[in-house]
Swiss-Prot record:
SUPFAM superfamilies, sorted: Nucleic acid-binding proteins
Organism annotation: Sus scrofa (Pig)
Gene Ontology CC: cytoplasmic side of rough endoplasmic reticulum membrane; cytosolic small ribosomal subunit; nucleolus; ribosome; small-subunit processome
Protein name (Swiss-Prot/TrEMBL): Small ribosomal subunit protein uS12
Modified residues (N6-acetyllysine): K135
Cellular compartments annotated: Cytoplasm, Cytosol; Cytoplasm; Rough endoplasmic reticulum; Nucleus, Nucleolus
Record InterPro entries: NA-bd_OB-fold, Ribosomal_uS12, Ribosomal_uS12_euk/arc
UniProt subunit comment: Component of the 40S small ribosomal subunit. Part of the small subunit (SSU) processome, composed of more than 70 proteins and the RNA chaperone small nucleolar RNA (snoRNA) U3.
Modification 3-hydroxyproline occurs at: P62
Keywords: Acetylation, Cytoplasm, Endoplasmic reticulum, Hydroxylation, Isopeptide bond, Nucleus, Ribonucleoprotein, Ribosomal protein, Ubl conjugation
């Protein structure tokens, strides 16, 4: 049996389309609101947080490395997340209890590459860009 094709079937076609929209993954994610609730950022692109500890996350097979990450507690809602620290030696610019700005890490809420369970990356430390610190253009403010 196919779809209704006759005159006066607009209501049926419309209700059928409305019901079947919910089988589409993207539509369901956008309209249920549960994905937004589960997102630590609460729909925002960036969030500030306090560094709790530095952690090393082991890369997934077949790679063998310890990826440098930090545990961050977000200021806006108190949720704890793990954020990747990009570039070589940038973990040295970050200390515990620092305020960091964290952003998403690529794949729309999924982990990236060989780093399991890490969905965020550090962008700024103490209101100074991590990239500027890495390139030597700026220095960390003395506190």
């Amino acid at each position: 049996m196919g779809k209704c094709r006759g005159l006066r079937t607009a209501r049926k076609l419309r209700s059928h389309r409305r019901d079947h929209k919910w089988h589409d993954k993207q539509y369901k994610k956008a309209h249920l609101g549960t994905a937004l609730k589960a997102n630590p950022f609460g729909g925002a692109s960036h969030a500030k947080g306090i560094v709790l500890e530095k952690v090393g996350v082991e890369a997934k097979q077949p790679n063998s490395a310890i990826r440098k990450c930090v545990r961050v507690q977000l200021i806006k809602n108190g949720k704890k997340i793990t954020a990747f620290v990009p570039n070589d030696g940038c973990l040295n610019f970050i200390e515990e209890n620092d305020e960091v700005l964290v952003a998403g890490f690529g794949r729309k809420g999924h982990a990236v590459g060989d780093i399991p369970g890490v969905r965020f990356k550090v962008v700024k430390v103490a209101n100074v860009s991590l990239l500027a610190l890495y390139k030597g253009k700026k220095e960390r403010p003395r506190s």
